[in-house]
Regions:
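Well-ordered alpha-helical scaffold segments within catalytic/enzyme domains
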Residues: 206-222, 256-270, 313-351, 411-429, ...
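Acidic/His metal-coordination segments adjacent to aromatic residues that form catalytic metal sites
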Residues: 236-243, 291-299, 388-402, 455-465, ...
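CBM-like carbohydrate-recognition segments
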Residues: 132-134, 163, 169-206, 218-225, ...
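Oxyanion-binding "anion nests"
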Residues: 22, 28-33, 411-460
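Long, well-ordered core segments of solenoidal/helical folds
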Residues: 169-188, 226-244, 275-294, 335-339, ...
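Extracellular/periplasmic carbohydrate-active domains that bind, remodel
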Residues: 1-162
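Extracytoplasmic mature domains of secreted/periplasmic and thylakoid-lumen proteins
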Residues: 247-312
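Aromatic- and glycine-enriched pocket-lining scaffold segments that form the walls
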Residues: 294-385, 393, 409
Length: 582
């Protein structure tokens, strides 16, 4: 093969179905040879292309890509649309190429995740001038095994090839990458600085910044410390007012960042921050509850318990309870203490009783959530539970939502392990939470993808549109590794966590070279931006699988970056760092 649009080409505008194609023992080379293996189709006719095998092919040079899969071919062509084409089970093995612009290109479509199960194994491409792997729109389950470009192994996240990592720690590398992308922390989470010039108060910022805080504690770096401290400095005034916080919303999401603020305040204590922390705790004292005593997720989500909300509220309550009891914030006074606080460093018997009551309430809430969201058929936990069984997304008999969203399960597992961080060793009900953690994470292992080591976005559905998702995968990995380190879990959980972390690096971490010559950044890819249920004014958020698949996927979602940092710090305790890859 010396010329043409491709050495092996499947399809075009009228491709329809193609399957069981074998190409092997071929030689190709020409500056006019556009591609080695090309699959092209679009939504005009749809169809399914599958079971394509290319092996033992030697290529001198090609003009564009060694492999290109394009299901968005001729997107402006005037024709009837809406027929989704699927491409899957494509193998390229033992293929060499000495010159090209790209290694692998995949052009998906925005509507569906229709390109998947693509394998490149034992392939070597040299003199790739632009990018080893370029992906556009949606695709998943892309597997690279012993795939070398310009002498370096390439993972399936589409990394640029770099000679050496600028940091030994992936946690430092990600932290400094995020600081470079977002110079001011009040604008994390893709916040529009024009619409929100004062920034946003959001649980999302707190999660990522707390991961950075722990990176600082592990590795130092005054720049990291200064960066994380800018958030409370800018968002909380000296009189304790928080920009964007509305007590009357009774929104558990707004409490999560208090967990970060409480810890960070020790670096530069400020009275205004302490006043704000009391206000957040006061919300928890007065938060509306279901008839069984579990917090509503938000005022607008009345009578509803979400796995998300357990993480947003209960770890902060557990951590802050001893301090708040000393400060006189009790259920009886609704968080507004009368008189002077005790100056004694020790709790009185009455205060100890109040503190134990707080702990009991925390364990009661998480165990009730466990019972109400657990699905015996799958061994998983549903995203949410409507205690009145009346919401449009809820099962009328059980009150449960339809599916298990992986990130909701991630919130639930992180809530458990963080509650254990602060429940005293001698607290009578501590073992209940440890047992729950074992049960929850064992279920996670049961649903861990054996090929990639990570997890799918909707855990209880097998469908070609489902995709491996990074934020939940980072959460589970963090909990598996930390739980094993602290002795809550046996070594099988640690091994699952190690497998998962390597899967994160191979499938989700992309290295981005910088045109200005500064240090290459890394990105966490394939994170779903959001998924929720309702409220009534948002009927499209109905908890169906189609709904979950409709939410956008993006890079560097802070809800994944924070847990990635925590998972990385756990792996570093086991001796793993960037030198394991470079």
């Amino acid at each position: 093969m010396e010329d043409g649009h491709g050495g092996v080409v499947l399809g075009s505008e009228i491709s329809a179905g193609v399957e069981n194609v074998f190409a092997e023992n071929c030689k190709m080379s020409s500056p006019n040879l556009d591609r080695v293996l090309r699959i092209k189709t679009n939504t005009c006719r749809g169809g399914e292309t599958k079971n394509v095998y290319m092996r033992n092919v030697t290529v001198g040079e090609c003009k564009e890509s060694v492999m290109r899969i394009n299901i968005n071919y001729q997107p402006k062509e005037a024709s009837e649309r809406g027929h989704i084409p699927y491409v899957h089970n494509v193998w390229m093995e033992n293929v060499t190429c000495q010159k090209s612009k790209y290694g692998v290109q995949i052009n998906g479509i925005k509507e569906k995740d229709a390109v998947y199960d693509i394998h490149v194994k034992n392939c070597t491409f040299n003199n790739v001038s632009v990018k080893p792997f370029l992906r556009e729109n949606r695709c998943h389950d892309i597997f690279f095994e012993n795939f070398k470009v310009n002498g370096k192994l390439v993972n399936a996240s589409g990394s640029d090839v770099v000679e050496k990592a600028p940091y030994k720690s992936y946690a430092e590398w990600m932290t400094y990458s995020e600081m470079k992308r977002n110079p001011n922390p009040i604008y994390l989470d893709f916040t529009d600085s024009i619409k929100h010039p004062k920034g946003k108060w959001s649980y999302v910022m707190g999660i990522e910044l707390e991961g950075m805080l722990d990176t600082y504690y592990a590795h130092g770096g005054e720049a990291i410390k200064d960066y994380v401290m800018r958030y409370p400095q800018q968002m909380i005034s000296d009189d304790g007012k928080t920009t964007g916080f509305k007590y009357e919303d009774f929104n558990l999401d707004n409490i999560r960042t208090a967990h970060f603020i409480f810890r960070a305040d020790s670096l530069a204590p400020r009275e205004g921050v302490r006043l704000a922390l009391k206000e957040y705790f006061r919300q928890l004292i007065n938060q509306p509850r279901t008839d069984e005593g579990v917090y509503w997720h938000k005022q607008i989500y009345h009578d509803q318990v979400w796995l998300d909300g357990i993480f947003m509220g209960l770890p902060y309550k557990t951590m802050a309870a001893p301090y708040m009891v000393k400060e006189g914030l009790t259920v009886a006074n609704k968080g507004i203490p009368a008189g002077k606080k005790s100056k004694s460093g020790k709790l009185t018997k009455g205060q100890q009783k109040e503190l134990t009551a707080y702990y009991d309430d925390i364990v009661d809430q998480i165990t009730m959530t466990d019972a109400r969201t657990y699905d015996e058929k799958t061994g998983l936990w549903k995203h949410a539970w409507d205690s009145k069984h009346g919401m449009f997304w809820a099962d009328k008999k059980t009150g449960q939502s339809r599916h298990t969203w992986a990130r909701a399960m991630g919130w639930f597992t992180m809530a458990q392990i963080e509650i254990l961080d602060y429940l005293p060793e001698d607290y009578a009900r501590r073992q209940e939470v440890i047992d729950m953690l074992n049960k929850t994470l064992r279920a996670c292992i049961d649903y861990q993808d054996p090929a990639t080591g990570v997890w799918y976005d909707v855990m209880d559905v097998k469908d070609p549109r489902n995709y491996i998702e990074s934020t939940a995968s980072c959460m589970f990995t963090y909990c598996l590794l930390k739980g094993a380190r602290l002795g809550y879990l046996d070594d099988s959980y640690r091994q699952a966590g190690i497998k998962a972390y390597k899967g994160i690096i191979n499938n989700f971490i992309r290295v981005d070279a910088q045109k200005d010559g500064s240090f290459p950044t890394i990105s966490l890819t394939e994170g779903v931006s959001v998924s929720g249920l309702g409220p009534e004014k948002s009927p499209h958020r109905d908890g169906t699988f189609d709904y979950y698949m409709s939410e956008p996927i993006r890079d560097n979602d802070p809800k994944g970056v924070g847990p990635f940092l925590w998972a990385t710090l756990e792996m570093e305790r086991l001796g793993y760092n960037t030198s394991s890859q470079y």
